Amino acid sequence: MTKIYFIAGETSGDFIGGRIIQHLKDNIEIKCMGVGGKYMEEAGSFKSLFSITSINLMGFVEILPHIFKLKKLIDKTVEDITNSRADLLITIDSPGFTYRVAKRVRKLLPKLKMIHIVAPSVWAYKEDRAVKYAQIYDCLFALLPFEPPYFTRLGLDCRYIGHPIMEQEFYSDKVALRKEFKIDENERVLCVTLGSRKGEILRHLPVFVSSIEEIFKSCNNLKVIFTLANPAHEAIIKPFLEDVKFNYLFSSERLKTYAVADAALAKSGTNTLEIAASGTPMIVAYKVNLISFFIIRLLIKIKYVTLINIIAGSEIIPEFIQFNCRASLISNKLQELLFNSKKAYEQVIESQKILQKLGFESNRSPSYIAAEIIKQEFLKPKIKLLKEKD
């Protein structure tokens, strides 16, 4: 039986991995193992080597307290791969962890085929990473159509597969969703996304809650829905809401939440693409540790953090980053989107134009495309060889 070792370090990567495993198992027999979350464990029928929350970290300074734990997990993963006798290693995003593992595995198992899914954003910062990936991996799958040339010119086989949100089912019946969420006819709905990392949630909650309280002063028919990347996050958020006057609820059904909302307050990330694809206007707010921020500013070579703005070359979606991540600024702009239908409509239309450029309205299935490449070019030769030996 063909063995594939997977590594994903966060929820978005776990989702991609789970979908790819489902397609791989359609017509070939494989054994999956490695590091992943609920999607990969369910699809691959395996138990993750450890919880992905252990490596779901971001930022330069934020990682420092966990550096020795991360090193141990890298050691543990490398050892597990070498003992697994896997035929293929597939790493998904989380470059801080997956690249370090792959680099060491390459030295120990030089003949092992290795694929990385989600090309590093070398067009944004640290372009030298393209060279490093070309030295380690056999193939790279890119989510954005303009990314492959950054790697193919270095001799690395890089394929554009499309973004995973292309194969998600978005909701459009707002009337039905309002009934499902028990939202009154006169209520305005604000969706709030805080991220999947505990550190992100704790860092953004105070300013997000203050922003909402400012809005509530002039809008007492406001209902707030906090989207949960993990049901356990409700316990982290609740202490910050003990004295608030606005109505709120929690939801783990993020796509429904995005669609039912009149506007969204979002932290930077993949969620912004999902919100835009749901046809909901938003503002993006984000901050990191101060030292991490200055390091990032030295490395980064783009003006915006939201992918839609980056592609557009202009601020379609208002961004409030670091020192501008303040309740007074955020609340003013959110009120514009909640009560100025023209402003909200303009943002939605411009965002849709960018999504079309990225192919988000095509019939592509990134996970199916990835699975077919893996089967035809990386597994079929191995499967054929095994059959000949039998």
From Swiss-Prot:
Q: Which domain of life is it from?
A: Bacteria
Q: Name one GO biological process term.
A: lipid A biosynthetic process
Task: Name the UniProt key words of this record, in alphabetical order.
Answer: Glycosyltransferase, Lipid A biosynthesis, Lipid biosynthesis, Lipid metabolism, Transferase
Q: What are the recorded GO MF terms, alphabetically?
A: lipid-A-disaccharide synthase activity; phospholipid binding
- Identify the enzyme class: transferase
The coiled-coil segments of this chain are none
Q: What does this protein do?
A: Condensation of UDP-2,3-diacylglucosamine and 2,3-diacylglucosamine-1-phosphate to form lipid A disaccharide, a precursor of lipid A, a phosphorylated glycolipid that anchors the lipopolysaccharide to the outer membrane of the cell.
Q: Which PANTHER family match?
A: LIPID-A-DISACCHARIDE SYNTHASE, LIPID-A-DISACCHARIDE SYNTHASE, MITOCHONDRIAL-RELATED
HAMAP family listed in its UniProt record: LpxB (MF_00392)
Q: What is this protein called?
A: Lipid-A-disaccharide synthase
Q: Organism, per UniProt?
A: Rickettsia felis (strain ATCC VR-1525 / URRWXCal2) (Rickettsia azadi)
**Highest lineage ranks of the organism?**
Bacteria, Pseudomonadati, Pseudomonadota, Alphaproteobacteria, Rickettsiales
